[in-house]
A protein has these predicted regions:
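N-terminal small-residue-enriched
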Residues: 1-173
Length: 173
């Protein structure tokens, strides 16, 4: 497969053992970063996307997988860990998150209430808000199954179940 500049795509690891180890570059963005003196060396990683045939290519992803080198947890194991909390199956408005501060506020109509490690029922609708850095700082537990959920726009993201222990506020409507 090729990206929207015709460069062959490939697997690009971005984070390994909790450290940033790579970037996604289009040819254009790599050249611009070098020209502006922000970095010394960069080449295309086969990661160019376009929003249309008249728009310039930008760096992006077409198939992003969140995985771990550690063994993931089953759904049942994660329920035991949650004890009291919520299972959020999808959110709306994630694109409105502040990329600088990490603050986000999203809504969901697909949320389950968990008490004592068991699902007790659905919440009709809720708002979720918090700060991504705070939500991630106490560690993240990943599920053992990555499920492709389709593609939106020019990219898609495949996520296992993700357990955030703190840093998230749930505001049932």
């Amino acid at each position: 497969a090729r990206d929207d500049e015709g460069v062959p795509t490939r697997k690009n690891s971005l984070i390994e053992q909790g450290r940033l180890v790579g970037y996604l570059w289009s040819t254009r963005d790599a050249a611009q970063q070098i020209a502006e003196g922000r970095i010394d060396i960069a080449t295309s990683t086969g990661s160019a996307i376009r929003s249309g045939h008249q728009s310039p290519p930008v760096s992006g992803c077409s198939n992003l997988f969140l995985t771990s080198s550690q063994k993931g947890r089953s759904y049942e194991e994660m329920l035991e860990i949650i004890e009291d909390g919520y299972i959020v199956n999808s959110v709306m408005g994630a694109h409105t998150a502040n990329p600088t501060s990490g603050d986000f506020s999203v809504t969901t109509s697909s949320i389950l209430r968990v008490e004592g490690g068991e699902v007790i029922g659905a919440v009709k609708q809720a708002g979720l808000s918090g700060n991504l850095a705070n939500a991630l700082k106490d560690g993240v537990t990943l599920g053992d199954e990555v499920r492709p959920q389709g593609s939106y726009s020019s990219g898609s993201m495949y996520l296992p179940n993700v357990l955030l222990r703190n840093g998230l506020r749930v505001n049932p409507v």
